[in-house]
Amino acid sequence: MAPLVKQLEADPSIESIVCVTGQHREMLNQVLELFDITPHHDLALMTGNQTLNGLASRLIASLDDVLAAEKPDRVLVHGDTTTASASALAAFHRQIPVGHVEAGLRTGNLMQPWPEEMNRRLVDVISDLMFAPTAGSKANLHAESLSGRVIVTGNTVIDALFMTVARIDADAALRAELDARLLFIDDTKPVLLVTGHRRESFGTGFERICSALAELARRGDVQIVYPVHLNPNVRGPVQDKLGKLPNVHLIEPLDYVGFVRLMQRASIILTDSGGVQEEAPALGKPVLVMRDVTERPEAVAAGTVKLVGTRRESIVEAVSALLDDQGARDQFACRINPYGDGHASGRIVAALAGRPFEEFAQGALVQSLPVKAGSNIGSKHFV
């Protein structure tokens, strides 16, 4: 959302008001500082171990106060978080039109991911403007016969990535500062970057993931770098199974610029993150996704992503195949990224202002790929 906020700030025809709820506080503060954004409202609603229902009720009540005070003509929400669904519902209750950024992502299974799949479906039902990242997402929305206008824009996450990469590339001092945080990396060995935080993997799923990483670490010819999520459901099994392995580097979560630099230096990325599924292909990196289904089937069809699930054997087999074949890794640098060209935010602002614009040009390419809502682990698109 940050690139869109900056585009809105720069447009004299639109007055924008930024409200943050405090969900994912550590990451939020980093992004606000990086993009020089000062929220007009910071609700600071997150507390430890709160239930989703408790969070949603507090969000709706607090957001209702903001809407009553500001009386906006439109509310924009992003993605599939509880913040997004609660914001859309609060706006609906006040009959304020809603625009959904990153609309139309689907797995077809309400429990994968949970609760995100239901969150984004709810937001799309409420929205009268849906900014779909791809033609595949647009097709999902049309298949549901939703009444709102659907516009293919590309994803704003690619805007943020390109802005950040340009900053890193242009600033040698910044690169040196970022690399100084990664002095433990041995450039003579491939780097496996791991991120994992999905609720549906808590418990048995993370136990299997950690067992797979421990087995891969025994190869000795790979370095595993894992910025460990702050959630204790993640930290517990990760520390127990991987904390004492010499070629496994468990580090604190990085700020966005630092994480982009780490992705640039990675050889393979193993993740359950939706955003990383979009960002890493833009950097030419192989992505193995530790989920059984994805709402981003375009990447599977394009060959930039492979679903490996959370079974130990599947993870080990997929990572080993790439570690043992430099040529297979190199192929990813030549593949298409179907998620954006860095101009999604500009298209969204033009649509809001009523100015002419062209939809995401790669939409025709994505539409030609044989994908449906959600690709599962049995998909044959990956070559």
List each language-model region with its residue ranges:
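Nucleotide-activated sugar donor-binding and catalytic core shared by glycosyltransferases
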Residues: 1-226, 231-383
